[in-house]
UniProtKB/Swiss-Prot annotation:
Its EC number is 1.8.4.8. GO terms for cellular component: cytoplasm. This is Phosphoadenosine 5'-phosphosulfate reductase. Keywords: Cytoplasm, Oxidoreductase. The gene is cysH. The lineage of its organism: Bacteria, Pseudomonadati, Pseudomonadota, Gammaproteobacteria, Enterobacterales. It comes from Pectobacterium atrosepticum (strain SCRI 1043 / ATCC BAA-672). Belongs to the PAPS reductase family. CysH subfamily. It holds the Pfam family PAPS_reduct. One of its GO terms (molecular function) is phosphoadenylyl-sulfate reductase (thioredoxin) activity. It is found in: Cytoplasm.
Length: 244
């Protein structure tokens, strides 16, 4: 179908890409998450990949997509600063769901980065953005290239933050199709899916964390805080992977 010609869509300006995909996004909004995944696998170009931060609700998209494509490469960008509980969660889900896990890291180790640049996350928005570029964006770009990705699944939800509030199910990002099957799910739907499928939240959920990233830029939720304020000292919501 011409509307899913990735090369042709990549040649368009961003606003024209959005317009070209508007009709199909309207149709996708009417489907269930499972139906959306089926549609993507049938209509969008491979190779398919799924990214996961192994955060609070990570089990959902991992389970949802691997039920239909068990061997899909699962991309984790490991900064080296994840919580011990996150690494344990990764191991547990990889075993439980038999994930085809691909771990990507920055070219420079965490210790080497600190010796060269200091603690970038303590250097304001500019430092955080450089840190994210080194540890998230570049490794993800490398993963998409090495895995020859044509379609990238991710587990973002509109309810998570204002920056995600207008995201469509289907878009173009980093030169590939970006597909968000649970974009319209609320917290109740998340809970129900986890319960019905014998899946767990991230271990730190029970300790008051609403969102989990690196140890140095993640805070427990406290009364009066938004979920966005628990990450990057409230200066940013996105780590760079889902921007652009």
């Amino acid at each position: 179908m011409a509307e899913f010609n990735l090369e042709a869509l990549n040649a368009l300006p961003k606003d024209e890409q959005v317009a070209a995909l508007a009709a199909v996004n309207g149709q996708l909004e009417q489907l269930s998450a499972q139906e959306r995944v089926s549609w993507a696998l049938e209509n969008l170009p491979g190779d398919f990949v799924l990214s996961s931060s192994f955060g609070i609700q990570a089990a959902i998209s991992l389970h949802l997509v691997t039920q239909q494509r068990p061997d899909i490469p699962v991309i984790l960008t490991d900064t080296g600063y994840l919580f011990p509980e996150t690494y344990q969660f990764i191991d547990a889900l990889t075993e439980q769901l038999k994930l085809n896990l691909h771990v990507y890291r920055a070219a420079e180790s965490p210790a080497w980065q600190e010796s060269r640049y200091g603690k970038l996350w303590d250097q304001g928005v500019e430092g955080i953005e450089r840190y994210n570029l080194l540890n998230k964006v570049e490794p993800m770009n490398r993963a998409l290239s090495e895995l020859n990705a044509g379609t990238w699944f991710a587990g973002l939800r509109r309810e998570q933050s204002g920056s995600r509030g207008e995201l469509p199910v289907l878009a173009i990002q980093r030169g590939v199709f970006k597909f968000l099957p649970i974009i319209d799910w609320d917290n109740r739907t998340v809970y129900q899916y986890l319960k019905e499928n014998g899946l767990s939240y991230h271990p730190l959920w029970d300790q008051g964390y609403l969102s989990v990233g690196d140890t140095h830029t993640t805070r427990k939720w406290e009364p009066g805080m938004s979920e966005e304020e628990t990450r990057f000292f409230g200066l940013k919501r996105e780590c760079g992977l889902h921007e652009g």
